[in-house]
Regions:
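Bacterial signal peptide processing site
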Residues: 6-8
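A short, conserved alpha-helix within the catalytic core of class I
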Residues: 140, 162-175
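Conserved beta-strand signature within the Rossmann-like core of class I S-adenosyl-L-methionine
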Residues: 94-96, 183-192
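A short glycine-rich, Lys/Arg-flanked "PGG" loop and its adjoining helix->strand segment in the class I
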Residues: 84-85, 169-182
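A short acidic, Gly/Pro-enriched loop at the edge of an enzyme's catalytic core
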Residues: 130, 143-154
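Conserved class I S-adenosyl-L-methionine
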Residues: 64-75, 83
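C-terminal motif of bacterial Sec signal peptides marking the signal peptidase cleavage site
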Residues: 2-4
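C-terminal lobe and adjacent flexible extensions of AdoMet/dcAdoMet transferase-like proteins
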Residues: 220, 259-279
């Protein structure tokens, strides 16, 4: 009988790693299928060489059964095209968008309305992939992204420089912390400035130091869990005349310099994973 019990324990121990490996393989296959989907805008897919969605989302440990909030999806829903289908069956993907009526009247409000309308149209065009995408509108000076403690992962791609420039970054990181479950993940990708760059230069260039982003997160209560080189670009010197917008995809430069900046590619980016400590 003792031998039988020991054997059962050994079998259970052996099955646990195998089961974990099987789940990881299934998640990877589902992510690959979402990245390869023919519903993606070809222009978006062509930028995978710069944005590395597989490596990035794997590093952030996003799985198909999670509740995930992406903050102000860029590029007409660049990551929405991947995360919407990936999370459709077992998880929940929420695109958090600025409420146009909470934006300043005029160009700002008009721009946010167009941004929202364009994303809605994109989602409506492919219901088989995007019919379960949730939208949450928020006020930029009072951001709130979910019920407290309800989200597994919050993701933000190339947004933090906007909040730093607008003086609202601390509000956003606190809202991320509030939305996440204890043990939840905050994934941040951001244009990376050279260490020691002063705040005014960061605001003008769109590049932020890792030190600043880490401080914003840890001041809000997060713990830095890991860094990834997935979106690093050593060709980017981060000192361009028109800041990060000099580079693709914005390409704010003289036409004769196009080849130079195309050879550099998109910006050098930090990829940081933070965790909300378990209570």
């Amino acid at each position: 009988m003792l031998v039988s019990c020991a054997t059962a324990r050994e079998d259970a121990t052996a099955k646990a790693p195998a089961s974990a490996a099987s789940h990881a393989a299934a998640h990877a296959a589902a992510l690959d299928a979402a990245i390869a989907g023919d519903w993606r805008d070809p222009k978006n897919a062509s930028r995978d060489i710069y944005r590395h969605p597989r490596e990035t989302l794997t590093f952030f440990a996003v799985t198909p059964d999670q509740k995930v909030v992406e903050i102000t999806p860029g590029g007409g829903g660049w990551y929405t095209e991947i995360l919407g289908p990936y999370l459709r069956e077992r998880g929940v993907y929420t695109a958090a968008m600025v409420d146009p009526m909470a934006a300043a009247e005029g160009r700002s409000r008009d721009g946010q309305q167009k941004y929202l309308d364009d994303l809605k149209a994109r989602l409506a065009a492919r219901p088989a992939q995007f019919d379960r995408v949730a939208l949450r509108l928020f006020a930029p000076k009072q951001p709130s992204f979910a019920d407290a403690g309800s989200i597994d992962t919050v993701l933000t791609f190339r947004n933090v420089h906007n909040w730093v420039a607008g003086g609202t970054a601390e509000l956003y990181f606190k809202a991320f912390y509030d939305a996440l479950k204890p043990g939840g993940t905050l994934g941040v990708v951001e244009h990376r400035a050279k260490p020691g760059t002063d705040l005014d230069a960061m605001k003008k260039s769109g590049y932020l130091t890792e030190e600043l982003v880490i401080r914003l997160a840890t001041d809000a209560g997060f713990r830095l869990d890991a860094k990834s080189k997935a979106n690093a670009n050593p060709k980017d010197t981060a000192d361009h005349k028109n800041g990060v917008w000099t580079l693709p995809p914005t390409n704010r430069h003289d036409p004769e310099d196009a080849a130079t900046y195309r050879a550099i590619g998109e910006s050098d980016r930090m990829t940081l994973r933070f965790v909300k400590p378990a209570q």
